[in-house]
Amino acid sequence: LNKVPVSRMSSSTVGSLLSARGHFTVFAPDNDAVQAYLDTLAMKNIIASASWDGFSDSTTLDSIRKVIVYNSVINSGDNLPAYDVAQFPINDGGEFSKSNMYDRKLIVNYFDDPDSITINGALMDARNNNIRVLNGYVHCVHSVVAPTNNTLGYLLNKIYTEKESGYYVSSMLVHAVGMLDTLQRYRDDEYEQAYQTGQVPEMIAHESGVGYTTGKLPEHRYYGFTFFAETDDVWEREIGKNRFDITVDDVVSWLKENGYYPTAKTDENYHSEDNILNQFVTYHFLPMRLASDRLVLHWNEKGYSSQRKQPTVVQYEYYTCMGKRRLVKFLESAESDGVCINRFPKIDNSRRGSYHEISCDADKAGIKVPIPETEGEFNVRNGIVYPIDQIMAYTEDVQHNLHKERIRFDIASAMPEMMNNDIRLQYYSLGQRWGFPFTSQYPYFDDVFIGDESWFFYYNGYNETMKNYQGDELNVRGFLDITFRLPPVPADGIYEIRFNVQSEGHNRGMVQFYWGENKDNLPPMGIPLDIRTSGLERRTTSGTFPSNVGWERDTQDDDYNAEVDKKLRNNGFMKGAEIYCDGGQGLSTMARADPVIVRRIIVREPMKADETYYLRFKSVLDDQTREFYMDYLEYCPKEVYDNPETPEDIW
């Protein structure tokens, strides 16, 4: 500890850092663990002998010391707590929300026989853990925590070229479609340079007052990937050949024979997004690194407690896969027995229902997501591999089922950079906001285009009591001009796009929405929306006035409540969703019962599954003190919102 500097720019040591104020978690390897690590280095001929005297040069010695020390320490800073065992991620394969000093996420696994915990495969001592010190916790481990620096691309290429069993066929297919170079990426070095040299300027303060800081710019722009990979056992079962005898042609023939991707091309241009194999393989990848506790986010849905951390009502996420853009649905509930891919259960979603699963047909049960592969060489720096035991595909049945449901997504979930750079799902600290550069300064987001003088902030209300779906929100100060590339719709048809807004603030603004296919020439959608208007009031800096949009509190008469909902829809409004609390966890009042939380219907147009659509928000008030608020969007097909037999649910 006392021989490893805190950073390249500092002469202070990690030992000095751990003697100071703060909140630190240390996974300290015992002497036998360090010796075993030196033995491994000697076997790999990295050092001459398995001792500290076996290093031939100081550079290698310093590097190994840094690996051992940096990977052992999580610095939670001044505002967030250190981790005792009770605060470890509860999911098997879950990650600590804070990275270690090597900027790597550590993964926890739990075992029953005997009861034990590992940190990146390092067994934690059964007695010498949870050692409380003034500024944190120490947990003794029986091996050095040392994640590999390899990438997912390197791993899959190695499996393919060296014919390693387990994921040989899947890695062969990834190689065939030309994804390996993309999967090598882990950091945007151009952004590193821009950040370190001040090319990306500091943000303004989001609000004035004690404790409010400037928008914190991300230090890095990391890439990440999640791969749901069929095991070799699956392919042997489906193809009927030994895993090492299976060829790309075998898989393509099998896809055609089984009716997968019937509109795709069947030529040998596997790098093309129009190709059948390309569409099959890329659907297995998400452009973000998601540990098991981040596939479906839980925070303020009905009945959920972060103390018990047990799923309650049906909760879901919709992500866009890599390659040809298509939706992948992830669902977790009290009844689902973990996270499932493309699960479509029957839900108790009546007005007086529970929003729990009633049942699920076998052909709609989806794919159970198991514990990820995190041991040894699989613990790569830019990705996670989940082994799946059945074929994963974007079938016509999946598209049909997606087209029969309302698709709600937190706007931040459509921005992979939020997850890849530890911005989303972090604990709230007073006054802290993340800020992002204008696109002209640096394009931090692939799917968000930030105009000059649009000060774009992310407010992480996770573990707070804000009235936001999943706790967080995005907002903009200054002269608003933001364009989003939207996720795809699952099938051709007429859709509504709804925009959820919490209209409690007096400083909200008026916004013109634009929507269409040509990002640089989007037509306006209707008249500007005054997002200061709630269900009951219109709040302005000059006073509060009735909104007269038809909002009324629910009564015991559901027929009357349905009429109120129709009246609101006629005015372009909907009540908030019943699924989440009107604030933090454990509240008996849901968002639907709060008149300041409303959904605005901003688009009702035909949309095609193979088109890319954009949504632009532009302020119509010449007042840079106004604030634009964003929480979540909904796609709702006409078959749902205009269904006379089964009206859209309130959830």
Predicted feature locations:
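Mature, structured domains of secreted/extracytosolic soluble proteins
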Residues: 1-651
